[in-house]
């Protein structure tokens, strides 16, 4: 008989002890003093940015005013600022010229408007038969900014009595159609071309033979064809365009005296190479007082037969003059602003980023576009080594600074 009452073997209970580690395990091959050094570097970087922010707040106001004068429309800002914040050190007079004018375009004609860097002159214009370009028989005449004679006098020999030289920060133009929607027709085309003032020595048939220096314009051939980079749109949509300095430096140009026509009246057009004539008319009202380092904006308005095209033309430019010590303007001059690398860098960035032209309706948002370009550029520039990167790092984090200057 099997005994089933034998005691069963009891299994030993297994006890599992779990240890919870509350302290973080140091990473392998990373000493603690390395982490401390890294954290200290971050704190120092933030401290340096804070100090540069304070310095930038003091020094960048003329730079921001310079950007606003160069790119903001006059209905937003008419302050000429303190001048161009580059390495020039001297007394200057800043001026923002503005012209508002109603204009009508002749039917069956193509009207050419040149926004050229000529101080005191808002634009030059001429009309040619529809579908053609200016020829040797074409003469461009000026339309002045208000105050031309107060700045440059009423004679061709008094142009430099107040100021001796000048340089441009920007030129702007807008055409805002006012035509009846049932009567307008035609188109607007815009492009730019580099035009420079040149001095050429011509022989004079005298006994004994001699020569004379004559001022002529080179680059006007760019007006005779639509450039590859251009803007074309229906007339009723209008246009807005800007031109900025694309030279390495903002160089001053001399104020010229005794020039009413280019080429001069006693020099044949063919001998100078100019395709057409620039005539400023009576010296009591206008004149050619110089030519700056800016690309000329060319606007062609085509109006077919039967069209009734009218518009408001608005032009403005930001210029810096050097006043003469014995002139009344000298008392209104001021020292050129200190160097602002950030403002100059952003000026170049905006100039490269803007299109040749936009429709007139987008002029209202052009300053917003400029602000977005500046902000995005500063965010990218904060990673650049050197003073530009350091200053950009501070300014990109200081939104109140932008707001204080209209940004």
From Swiss-Prot:
It is an enzyme of class 3 (hydrolase). Gene3D superfamilies: 2.60.120.20. Ca(2+) 1 binds at residue 161. SUPFAM superfamilies: Positive stranded ssRNA viruses (SSF88633). The record marks 363-364 as: Cleavage. One of its GO terms (biological process) is symbiont entry into host cell via permeabilization of host membrane. Keywords: Aspartyl protease, Calcium, Capsid protein, Disulfide bond, Hydrolase, Metal-binding, Protease, T=3 icosahedral capsid protein, Viral penetration into host cytoplasm, Viral penetration via permeabilization of host membrane, Virion, Virus entry into host cell. GO terms for molecular function: aspartic-type endopeptidase activity; metal ion binding. Ca(2+) 3 binds at residues 161, 221. GO terms for cellular component: T=3 icosahedral viral capsid. The active site is at 75. Ca(2+) 2 binds at residues 161, 221, 273. Residues 13-32 have a biased composition (Low complexity). Its EC number is 3.4.23.44. Disulfide bonds join 69-318. The record marks 402, 405, 407 as: Interaction with viral RNA genome. Transmembrane segments: none annotated. Belongs to the peptidase A6 family. This is Capsid protein alpha. It comes from Flock house virus.
């Amino acid at each position: 008989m099997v005994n089933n009452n034998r005691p069963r073997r009891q299994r030993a209970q297994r006890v599992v002890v779990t240890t919870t580690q509350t302290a973080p395990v140091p990473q392998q091959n990373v000493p603690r003093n390395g982490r401390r050094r890294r954290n200290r570097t971050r704190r120092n970087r933030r401290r340096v940015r804070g100090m540069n922010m304070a310095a930038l707040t003091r020094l960048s106001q003329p730079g921001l005013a310079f950007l606003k004068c160069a790119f903001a429309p006059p209905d937003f800002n008419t302050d000429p600022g303190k001048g161009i914040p580059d390495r020039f050190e001297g007394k200057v007079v800043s001026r923002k010229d503005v012209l508002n004018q109603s204009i009508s375009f002749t039917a069956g004609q193509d009207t050419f408007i040149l926004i050229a860097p000529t101080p005191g002159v808002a634009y030059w214009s001429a009309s040619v038969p529809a579908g053609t370009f200016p020829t040797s028989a074409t003469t461009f005449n000026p339309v002045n900014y208000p105050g031309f004679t107060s700045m440059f006098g009423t004679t061709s020999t008094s142009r430099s009595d107040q100021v001796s030289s000048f340089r441009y920060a920007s030129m702007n133009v807008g055409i805002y159609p006012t035509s009846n929607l049932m009567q307008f027709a035609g188109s607007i085309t815009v492009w730019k071309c580099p035009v420079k003032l040149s001095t050429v020595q011509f022989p004079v048939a005298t006994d004994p033979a001699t020569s004379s220096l004559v001022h002529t314009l080179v680059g006007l051939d760019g007006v005779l064809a639509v450039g590859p980079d251009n803007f074309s749109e229906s007339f009723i949509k209008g246009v807005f365009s800007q031109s900025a300095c694309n030279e390495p430096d903002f160089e001053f140009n001399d104020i010229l005296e005794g020039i009413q026509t280019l080429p001069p009246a006693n020099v044949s057009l063919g001998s100078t190479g100019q395709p057409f004539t620039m005539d400023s008319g009576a010296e009591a009202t206008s004149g050619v007082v110089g030519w700056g380092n800016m690309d000329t904006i060319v606007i062609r308005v085509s109006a077919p037969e039967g069209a009734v095209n009218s518009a408001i033309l608005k032009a403005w430019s930001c210029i810096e003059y050097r006043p003469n010590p014995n002139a009344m303007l000298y008392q209104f001059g001021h020292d050129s602003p200190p160097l602002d690398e950030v403002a100059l860098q952003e000026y170049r960035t905006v100039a490269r980023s803007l299109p040749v032209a936009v429709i007139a309706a987008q002029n209202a948002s052009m300053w917003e576009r400029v602000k977005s370009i500046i902000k995005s550029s500063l965010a990218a520039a904060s990673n650049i080594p050197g003073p530009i990167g350091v200053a950009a790092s501070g300014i990109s984090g200081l939104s109140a600074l932008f707001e204080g200057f209209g940004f």
